[in-house]
Amino acid sequence: MYNCAIILAAGKGKRMKSSMPKVVHKVCGKEMVNHVIDNVRKANIKDVNLVIGKGSETVKEHTKDRNVTYSMQEEQLGTGHAVICAEEFLKDKKGTVAIFTGDAPLITNETIQQLFEFHNSGKYAATLISSTVQDPTGYGRIIREASGEVKKIVEHKDCNEEELKVNEINSGMYCFDIEVLLNSLKNLNNDNSQGEYYLTDVIEITKKSGDKVGAIVVPYEEIMGVNSRVQLSEAEIVMRKRINHKHMVNGVTFIDCESTYIDVDVEIGNDTIIYPGCVIQGNTTIKEGCTLYSNSRICNSVIGSGVIVENSVILESHVGEGTTVGPFAYIRPETKIGKSARIGDFVEIKKSTIGDNTKVSHLTYIGDAEVGSKCNFGCGTVVVNYDGQRKQKTIIGNNAFIGCNTNLISPVKVNDNTYIAAGSTITNEVPEGSLAIARSKQINKEGWLDKKGLLKK
């Protein structure tokens, strides 16, 4: 059986008050429309078409790696009109098409699979997703036959007294036999107060043709649409709870779930402990047995097993197993830190490689450098990597000892097994086995304060 999906992503999203199309706003680090696409794909639906409109180039840019096709809706004339715009996508296809909305990011792949299975096994011409809510005010009601089949969808304003008591509501997400849908679209009109073409009318047309219409009921959170920043925040809360629950089931400890923020694509190994206030973003991988203390942010990075991070920021970098980072360290993009290293307080590292067992304990800047293993950086060391025009490279070998308050003027090379005296400014290569001293000789001028009249008596 051929299955495909159409995702409606052309809405303007006026209530978002944003220059961006609504569907590219993110929930837990991923665009809403990409949440829907990815869950459709997890349900083994490979052929996906997006109906796009306002801000189409932006939507294309955010979905370019999702292998989808596009249909253009120049004017937003209703959900039915959006599907009419995708008729070319459905042309010559036989099978089943599901229709989802790009602003409902909480739909799960399990529900999508259930929708197709229910639709196909029941031999329905159309199947819709519904939900039951305590307060259905404003929603279209699902009115069922005694057999359980869907009889009709009635908009709230058109409900009679009995229909107003119904608390099963329409989600705006459907499954259709493709041939039935295309035939029904031919009979769709905009004879209503808004002058729009409604997809709900397709259900009525299908029913009048004598075809079966069914519905599956899912939790409300799965069909919750996002039309404002308030609803975006509500969707974020639901998604964050799902994400944190998944990690806890897989053996991760959260000291406080409510104040821990993890993006949807993050992977975390078991026996990792995460303290309040941590933010883990993008395609980050945290391996097993790590401890992330409060107020740490990690983005698009790989953190090896047994790493301890405290009050620090790690961006687009790799930290080897058994390393400690922080407090208050800043690991900038393209940094690779080896195993069992120590990156201490107020240390900034940028676009550098740090070898195994190297210690950079405090108040140090390392940029555009290659640092070997078992090195020690004293407090206040600075790799001076910018010459005023371009960034230059520094190379430091294994077992180098860099004394406190040292400046390494790039480009420069410090070879294996070297010592640099505290307070030095190194501008030339330091040979292996050498002690480098590059500082002015101390001069004591005795009686100078007395001569200047500055001596306090």
Swiss-Prot record:
Protein origin, superkingdom: Bacteria
Sequence segments annotated as region (Linker): 230-250
One GO BP annotation of this record: cell morphogenesis
Cofactor dependency: Mg(2+)
Similarity comment text for this entry: In the N-terminal section; belongs to the N-acetylglucosamine-1-phosphate uridyltransferase family.
Stretches the record annotates as N-acetyltransferase: 251-457
Organism (species): Clostridium botulinum (strain Langeland / NCTC 10281 / Type F)
GO molecular function: glucosamine-1-phosphate N-acetyltransferase activity; magnesium ion binding; UDP-N-acetylglucosamine diphosphorylase activity
Pathway(s) where this gene product acts: Nucleotide-sugar biosynthesis; UDP-N-acetyl-alpha-D-glucosamine biosynthesis; N-acetyl-alpha-D-glucosamine 1-phosphate from alpha-D-glucosamine 6-phosphate (route II): step 2/2; Nucleotide-sugar biosynthesis; UDP-N-acetyl-alpha-D-glucosamine biosynthesis; UDP-N-acetyl-alpha-D-glucosamine from N-acetyl-alpha-D-glucosamine 1-phosphate: step 1/1; Bacterial outer membrane biogenesis; LPS lipid A biosynthesis
NCBIfam families the UniProt entry points to: glmU, PRK14354.1
Pyrophosphorylase, as annotated region: 1-229
Signal peptide boundaries: none
Binding site for Mg(2+): 103, 227
Enzyme class: transferase
Ligand binding (UDP-N-acetyl-alpha-D-glucosamine): 8-11, 22, 73, 78-79, 140, 155, 170, 227, 332, 350, 365, 376
Protein name per its UniProtKB record: Bifunctional protein GlmU
Keywords associated with the record: Acyltransferase, Cell shape, Cell wall biogenesis/degradation, Cytoplasm, Magnesium, Metal-binding, Multifunctional enzyme, Nucleotidyltransferase, Peptidoglycan synthesis, Repeat, Transferase
UniProt-annotated binding residues for acetyl-CoA: 385-386, 422, 439
Manner of cofactor binding, per the entry note: Binds 1 Mg(2+) ion per subunit.
